């Protein structure tokens, strides 16, 4: 039996990580076989790559290098953690996946969505999520939350301009328009508890529909 692969996308400061943690805890409490993980990271090799990608000192990183590093981390994470969990029949909740690369490097960095998609096609080897939950929030609100959250892990992408984050949002909107059947869009400007309850309901409804 194969499990369900659910990914979470959105701009910086959208609140994905907090909601994923709460959803994971509640699903475990209810007896679901569920695993939560993140990209880049989730396993030792990918966490090491994450440190290189997001280190604030690495300001000279080329956009293509960045895209390739994300794809490398993604491949190892899939092979070592995600795919084995899916084969065990678990539901996998993943904080970011290939759509992040398409929106950030493909669109906002200007490498081209098709170019970055081709890199990632090799990395993911056909593994795609059955559902992607997109946390919709304006770049202004997202950056405001980042600066207000002193406990949040700061990274190199937080240092980007408002224009860059606006391009990221445009990139996501383009991806959603291309695959509307896969995406569920959540208004992440709402109170966190409301967002959490909506996300939990959508996931549970989807699992029931797929008899998982």
From Swiss-Prot:
It comes from Bacillus pumilus (strain SAFR-032). GO terms for cellular component: cytosol. GO terms for molecular function: ATP binding; dTMP kinase activity. Belongs to the thymidylate kinase family. ATP binds at residues 10-17. The keyword Metal-binding does not apply. PROSITE patterns: THYMIDYLATE_KINASE. This is Thymidylate kinase. It holds the Pfam family Thymidylate_kin.
